[in-house]
A protein has these predicted regions:
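Glycine-enriched alpha-helix->loop->beta-strand junction motifs that scaffold or abut catalytic
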Residues: 2-9, 29-33, 50-60, 80-82, ...
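Catalytic cores of alpha/beta
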Residues: 2-4, 41-51, 87-110, 122
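Glycine-rich phosphate-binding active-site loops on the catalytic face of alpha/beta enzymes
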Residues: 3-20, 57-66, 105-124
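Metal-dependent enolase-superfamily TIM-barrel catalytic cores that perform enediolate-based chemistry
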Residues: 4-40, 47
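Short loop-to-alpha-helix "cap/lid" segments that border enzyme active sites
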Residues: 16-23, 40-50, 54, 62-82, ...
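Active-site flanking residues adjacent to catalytic metal/cofactor-binding acidic residues
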Residues: 37, 57, 87
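C-terminal helical cap(s) of enzyme catalytic domains, especially alpha/beta-barrels
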Residues: 78, 101, 116-134
């Protein structure tokens, strides 16, 4: 990834071991790359180390592909306060983004909602306006 010009890598806890996660995180840090550690449930929180400064919670169940936004709210109680939290998948409402921000999330991965629309650019602009509106 680094040789291709990437500035960050995604480590999906469900796809690698804890040892691999730690090894890849250390290597990325040596290469001055950011790491997004993606978790899917409570059982994966033991992948978190002090080296993980960005942690994503994927609301999509990898087995059924069903999304449950409550996962991000539940997992917020288990995440280190000094990390940047990213809520991933299933977000289609600006009010949800506000609620997630209120519990500590700083980033949001929203793709399907915009890509399924006929006007992704226009919908993104409206979505952002709704988020920042008082």
């Amino acid at each position: 990834a680094n040789l291709s010009g990437a500035s960050a890598i995604l480590l999906i806890a469900a796809a690698i071991t804890k040892e691999e996660s730690l090894r890849f995180t250390k290597l990325a840090n040596q290469l001055k790359m950011d790491v997004l550690l993606e978790l899917h449930d409570e059982s994966e929180t033991d992948y978190i180390t002090p080296l993980n400064s960005v942690i994503g919670i994927n609301n999509r169940n990898l087995g059924s592909f069903v999304t449950d936004l409550q996962k991000s709210f539940h997992m917020a109680k288990l995440l280190p306060q000094d990390a940047v939290w990213v809520s991933e998948s299933g977000i289609s409402d600006a009010n949800i983004v506000r609620e997630l921000r209120d519990v500590g999330y700083k980033g949001f991965l929203i793709g399907e909602y915009f890509m399924k629309s006929g006007n992704p650019e226009g919908n993104l602009k409206r979505f952002i306006q709704q988020i920042v509106a008082p």
